């Protein structure tokens, strides 16, 4: 895990050959949906493990079958809330939660419009009660403009949890700048920080639309009436 000196509290995993190989597979245009999803799960699991190293723990006395000794209790690991942004973040969350088995989970449905406005639409939020001792992890594969994450974080800023993190696959400097400008204390962990955004608001070189690549291209709204006629 590498601290990026351009920002406070921003980290990447560019020093991990395993994650870089997994990211390479995700970038390839020919990677199938199932392989893409599995790759996101692997990234989430590895990054979740690395996050546990940043959490507080305390020593505690325990009794083994042979004698008394000292054990470790990672108390922060028991107070995790993972907030997942539909839909591409589901595989990432699946990997994360393997490190935080008792985590509570929140779901947010949010989507970003097209250039030049990039308007954000949020139509569903279901999040557990947040407490002062909680570590909140917002999972979103792509930190592009940062506008979606900013809208999500605004919903919870008054809860004042112990820590607020964003875990993603790729980020653009523009997105990190936007998030940090409004939420300077939020910690950001991504597999890699890419070069920039293009005129359409996509990260480049990037990996395309993570949701479509993980789950397939969705039906267009205009096609929904045709679905009813199939019965």
From Swiss-Prot:
GO biological process: UMP salvage; uracil salvage
UniProt: 5-phospho-alpha-D-ribose 1-diphosphate binding residues: 87, 112, 140-148, 209
Essential cofactor(s): Mg(2+)
Binding site for uracil: 203, 208-210
Pathway it works in: Pyrimidine metabolism; UMP biosynthesis via salvage pathway; UMP from uracil: step 1/1
Reaction(s) this enzyme catalyzes, per UniProt: UMP + diphosphate = 5-phospho-alpha-D-ribose 1-diphosphate + uracil
Cofactor binding mode and count: Binds 1 Mg(2+) ion per subunit. The magnesium is bound as Mg-PRPP.
Enzyme class: transferase
EC number in record: 2.4.2.9
Family: Belongs to the UPRTase family.
Name of this chain's protein: Uracil phosphoribosyltransferase
Species for this entry: Methanococcus maripaludis (strain C6 / ATCC BAA-1332)
Gene: upp
């Amino acid at each position: 895990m590498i601290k990026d000196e351009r920002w406070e509290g921003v980290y990447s995993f560019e020093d991990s050959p395993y994650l870089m190989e997994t990211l390479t597979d995700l970038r390839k245009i020919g990677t199938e949906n199932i392989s893409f999803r599995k790759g996101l799960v692997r990234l989430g699991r590895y990054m979740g493990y690395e996050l546990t190293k940043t959490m507080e723990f305390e020593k505690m006395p325990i009794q083994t079958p042979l004698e008394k000794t000292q054990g470790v209790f990672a108390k922060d690991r028991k107070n995790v809330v993972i907030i997942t942004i539909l839909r591409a973040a589901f595989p990432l969350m699946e990997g994360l939660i393997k490190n935080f088995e008792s985590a509570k989970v929140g779901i947010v449905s949010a989507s970003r419009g097209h250039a030049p406005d990039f308007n954000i639409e949020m139509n569903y939020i279901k999040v557990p009660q947040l407490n002062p001792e909680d570590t909140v992890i917002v999972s979103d594969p792509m930190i592009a403009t940062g506008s979606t994450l900013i809208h999500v974080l605004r919903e919870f800023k008054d809860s004042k949890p112990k820590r607020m993190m964003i875990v993603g696959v790729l980020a653009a400097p523009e997105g990190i700048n936007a998030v940090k400008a409004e939420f300077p204390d939020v910690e950001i962990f991504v597999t890699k920080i890419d070069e920039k955004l293009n005129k359409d608001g996509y990260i480049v070189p990037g990996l395309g639309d993570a949701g479509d690549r993980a789950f397939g291209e969705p039906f267009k709204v205009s096609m929904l009436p045709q679905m009813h006629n199939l019965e």
